[in-house]
C-alpha cells in the first residue's frame, strides 16, 4: 500500500495539499475580517475571528508537522509545485494573521485614545 504522501499525483496527496491551501486561505480571510471588525469597534468579534484563524492555521500546521516528521524519519515524501504552493500559502497566512493581531491591538489602542 502506497502512503498518501509518497505519490504527489494521487488523489490522497492532492487532498492533503488542498487542505493546507484551504486552511491557509480561510485563516487569512478570517484575519482580514478581524481587522475590519476592529475598525468598526467590534473587538470581541475581532478576537473571535482571530481565534478561528488560529484554529485553521493549527490544523494546517499539524499536517505540515506530520510531513516534516515523516521526512526526518526517512520516509519518502513526494514533492511537487502544488505542495510548494501550499506551503507558501500557509506561511503567508501565518504572517498575515500575526500582523492582524498587531493591527487589531493598535486599532483598540487608537479607539481608546480617541474616546478619552
UniProtKB/Swiss-Prot annotation:
Give GO terms for biological process: phosphoenolpyruvate-dependent sugar phosphotransferase system
Which UniProt keywords are listed?
Magnesium, Metal-binding, Phosphoprotein, Phosphotransferase system, Sugar transport, Transferase, Transport
Q: Where does Mg(2+) bind?
A: 88
Alphabetically, the GO molecular function entries are: metal ion binding; transferase activity
The organism's place on the tree of life at top rank? Bacteria
**UniProt keyword Flavoprotein present:** no
Q: Which InterPro entries match?
A: PTS_IIA_lac/cel, PTS_IIA_lac/cel_sf
Query: Phosphohistidine occurs at which residues?
Result: 85
Q: Cite the PTS EIIA type-3 domain residue spans from the record.
A: 11-109
Cofactor(s) demanded: Mg(2+)
**Catalytic residue positions:** 85
User: What does the entry's cofactor note say about binding and number?
Assistant: Binds 1 Mg(2+) ion per trimer.
The UniProt induction remark is: Induced by growth on galactose.
Any Pfam family from its record, for instance, is PTS_IIA
Q: What the protein does?
A: The phosphoenolpyruvate-dependent sugar phosphotransferase system (sugar PTS), a major carbohydrate active transport system, catalyzes the phosphorylation of incoming sugar substrates concomitantly with their translocation across the cell membrane. Involved in galactose transport with PtcB and Lmg_0963.
**Assembly with partners or alone:** Homotrimer.
Domains (record comment): The PTS EIIA type-3 domain is phosphorylated by phospho-HPr on a histidyl residue. Then, it transfers the phosphoryl group to the PTS EIIB type-3 domain.
Protein name in UniProt: PTS system galactose-specific EIIA component
> Which organism does this record belong to?
Lactococcus lactis subsp. cremoris (strain MG1363)
Q: What is the lineage of its organism?
A: Bacteria, Bacillati, Bacillota, Bacilli, Lactobacillales
